[in-house]
C-alpha cells in the first residue's frame, strides 16, 4: 500500500476510534480487532462483538513502551527483567505486567494485571503513533470461528461495512507468545 493510501486508511480508522467504535487491522500473525482502551463504551462494543466475557481481561498493543506506561506498573521490574522484555520488543511477545489501581477494570477483567505488547507490525505502529496511544487488541474472529488472516475474511465474518485498515499480516503462523513480565512464566506459546 502506498504511503498516501496508508495515511488515508489510518486517518479513517482514527475517525472510527474517536467515535468509540471497533476497527480491524493486520497484526503480526492474524487480523486484530481493537478500540480505544480509555473508552468503556468502545471496549464493551468489542467484547459484545467477540462474545467475550469482561472478566477475561484484554491485551493492549502499542507503537512504543511509553504508550503503555500509563496502564502498567513497572516499578517492581529488575534491570534483568527490563533487559529481557526490551530484547523481545518490538515484536510478537506479549508481557503481563502488574496494573495500577487506575487501570480500568474493563481492561484488566478479574486480574490485577494487564497484558501488553509493543508491536513490530509497521501498519499498527503507524496507527498507534497517529492515534497517540495503544489499542485494545484481540484476534478478529467471531466466537467459534478461526481468526481472520485477510481483509476478505474479516468482511466475511463481520460484514462488508465493518471498518478495516487494509494491509497484510506479518506472516507469523501463531498468535503472540504471552509471558509474565516479573517471573517469565509462559502463559501461551507463540
Curated annotation (Swiss-Prot):
On whether Signal is a keyword of this UniProt record, the answer is: no
Arranged from A to Z, the UniProt key words for this protein are:
ATP-binding, Cytoplasm, Nucleotide-binding, Nucleotidyltransferase, Transferase, tRNA processing
- Provide the YrdC-like domain boundaries: 7-190
- Catalytic activity annotated for this protein? L-threonine + hydrogencarbonate + ATP = L-threonylcarbamoyladenylate + diphosphate + H2O
Localization annotation: Cytoplasm
Q: Which Pfam families match?
A: Sua5_yciO_yrdC
Which GO-annotated molecular functions does the record name? ATP binding; double-stranded RNA binding; L-threonylcarbamoyladenylate synthase; tRNA binding
What is any one of the record's Gene Ontology cellular component terms? cytoplasm
Q: Which domain of life is it from?
A: Bacteria
Query: In its UniProt record, which GO terms are filed under biological process?
Result: regulation of translational fidelity; tRNA threonylcarbamoyladenosine modification
Give EC number(s), comma-separated: 2.7.7.87
Annotated NCBIfam families: PRK10634.1 (NF007919)
Protein task: Required for the formation of a threonylcarbamoyl group on adenosine at position 37 (t(6)A37) in tRNAs that read codons beginning with adenine. Catalyzes the conversion of L-threonine, HCO(3)(-)/CO(2) and ATP to give threonylcarbamoyl-AMP (TC-AMP) as the acyladenylate intermediate, with the release of diphosphate.
Provide the family line: Belongs to the SUA5 family. TsaC subfamily.
Q: Which HAMAP family match?
A: TsaC
Q: Kindly provide the name given to this protein in its UniProt entry.
A: Threonylcarbamoyl-AMP synthase
- Organism the protein comes from: Escherichia coli O1:K1 / APEC
